[in-house]
Amino acid sequence: MMTDPKFIDVDGIRTRYFEKGSGEVLLLVHGSHFGTPDACESALDWEYNFDALAQSFRVIAMDKLGQGYTGNPKTDADFTMAATVKHAARLIETLGLKNVHVIGHSRGGYVVARLTLDHPELVRSCVIIDSGTLAPGPSKTEYIMKEAPKPRLSRESQRWCIEHYSFRPDHITQAWLDEAENIAKSTKYQETVRKMEDEGLKSKQFFTHLAVHKEETLNWIIQGKLTQPTLLIWGYNDPTAELKRGQMLFELIADANPNSEMHIINRAGHFCYREQPETFNQVIKGFVEKCAGSK
C-alpha cells in the first residue's frame, strides 16, 4: 500500500512523493500533464509496483509538477514540459540523490528521457514506458478521448478514459479512482484546467513548446547523446501509443546507444505496468540489477 506520503519544497513548489525500501534508487514518474481533462494521474499510478520493487530497491514515486498533490507551476510561462523536466531533476538534487534509475510512463517517459539527456550526472539508467509523447509519429489519443462522456473529469468519465487506454481494465481500483476524483475536485487542479483549457495555454504554449522540445530531444538521441543504459517497455496492445511507434523509437535509440533494449508485454495496453505488474516488476528488477552490477 502507498501510505505515508512525504512533502518537500523543490524551488518553492510543495512536492509530494512516496518512499520505501533501500538499495539502488528508483524514481517513478507517472504520465499525463497538468490540466488534462482525461484523467488525473499521480504517484498512486504505481500502486501495483511500489511495494514489490521496494523489496529490492529504494523506491521514490513522485507527483509531477502541477499534478497529484504537487503544487502548480509558479508562473504561466512554466506550463511547459521543460519546467516539468526541471522540477523532476531538482527533486533528485534536493533529495541529495545520484546514480538514480529513472522510470517514466507516457508523458513521464518523455520526462525521464529528457532528464537523462539534460542531467546525465544524476542518472544511472533510463526506463521509458509506452511514451507516445517521445515516440515518432502521430498519436491516437485525441481521437479516442473525444468520445469521453461528460462531464469530463467526473469519476465515470475518468474511468471511461482509463478503460480506453487499457487492454485489461480490471487493473482499475476504487482507491485509484478515489484519488483521481479527489484531485479533479481540488482547487489546485481546477486552476490548471482553467489555464490549459479555458485560457488556451495548452494550444498556445504547451503543445507548441513540446513540439520544438521533442524535435530537439529526438535529434539529441540520434546524435548519440543518450548514453546511459536505456530500456523501453511497451504494451503490445496499447491503443493510443501503438507498438509500431514504440519500435520506431527503439530503432532511433538502439542505432545510437548499444546499451539499449526493448521489452514488449503481451496482453497489456497503455498501462502495461499495471495491467501485467508481475511481468513488469520482474523486467525492472532484472534490468536495474544488471545496470548496478556493471558500475
Predicted regions and their residues:
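Catalytic active-site module of serine/aspartate enzymes centered on a nucleophile-bearing elbow/loop
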Residues: 256-295
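Conserved serine/cysteine hydrolase catalytic core
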Residues: 189-251, 261
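Flexible "cap/lid" loop of the alpha/beta hydrolase fold
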Residues: 113-117, 124-160
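Conserved HGGG/HGGXW glycine-rich cap/lid loop of the alpha/beta-hydrolase fold
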Residues: 13-71
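Acidic beta-to-alpha connecting loop that harbors the catalytic carboxylate
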Residues: 32, 236-238, 267-269
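Gly/Ala-rich beta-loop-alpha elbow adjacent to hydrolase catalytic centers
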Residues: 104, 108, 112
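Active-site loop/oxyanion-hole signature of alpha/beta-hydrolase fold enzymes
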Residues: 45-51, 61-103, 282
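Helix-loop "lid/cap" segments that line or gate small-molecule binding pockets
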Residues: 158-171, 179-187, 207-211
